[in-house]
Curated annotation (Swiss-Prot):
Organism of derivation: Methylibium petroleiphilum (strain ATCC BAA-1232 / LMG 22953 / PM1)
Residues annotated as catalytic: K80 (proton acceptor)
InterPro entries: Aminoacid_DH-like_N_sf, NAD(P)-bd_dom_sf, SDH_C, Shikimate_DH, Shikimate_DH-bd_N, Shikimate_DH_fam, Shikm_DH/Glu-tRNA_Rdtase
GO-annotated molecular function: NADP binding; shikimate 3-dehydrogenase (NADP+) activity
Name this polypeptide is given: Shikimate dehydrogenase (NADP(+))
Amino acid sequence: MKDRADAAARDRYAVAGHPVEHSRSPFIHARFAALTGEPIDYGRLPCPLDGFAATVSAFAASTGTGLGPARGCNVTVPFKFEAVALAAQLTPRAALAQAANTLRFDAEGWQADNTDGAGLVRDITVHAGVALQGATLLLVGAGGAAAGVLGPLLETGPQRLVLANRSPDRARTLVERHAALAALHGVTLEAAALDDCGDGYDIVVNATAASLAGATVPVTARVLRPGALALDMMYGPAAQGFLRWAAAHGAHGRDGLGMLVEQAAESFWFWRGVRPPTPAVLAELRAVIEGADT
């Protein structure tokens, strides 16, 4: 009877996307729950490409089988822009990004947040030990992933940030939306084409989906100064091509696993008001993934 009562007390969360079958978020949040004692259950919520809103709404209204109510979800590709439209209220960073990766099902209306940028900043500064303040930074891509991290990166005060994209017009639109924030923090913010984005950056972040498709790195090696940090938001096998490219050109390659864990911790805090410890979870997850790849 106690086990059944404990299950009924667990609030439900999920990761919503297409696809989500291989998502590591359930592992991460299960570890966060164990470390914090928070009573949650976290699963996967596959959404058809034309049915994101309906699927998430049905999940929010469901009661579950032997579990508590649905309280929120993470949102992954390709629905981060759609998630904004479902919310009654946006956090400032979700409003600026116009993309959300976290929904909270409050009784007075759904709340949307974007924790990607906070996760990336913490991974770079804490886990990689690289300072963003005063650095020169190239952010490659202008889709939902880039939109989610641009604001938090600007808030750290880099000297210069260039947003490079296959379509420069799309990059310019994102730059214009963030111009006031860049000015507030004294950052030179520019848009550029992939083949004309400068050289010698301290930090290069790949926010494109090129790695997922097995495509080559969309910029030339001249963007890397010797010893630069080169980070791909992907992880596991998808990131290996980028990491090999970085190493071959004298850069320190890093995948997106630390960002994944840190954005999850930020989501957990948004939902529960508790900030879980992350170093042990990151180490455990990396061991699991590297073990699966051997």
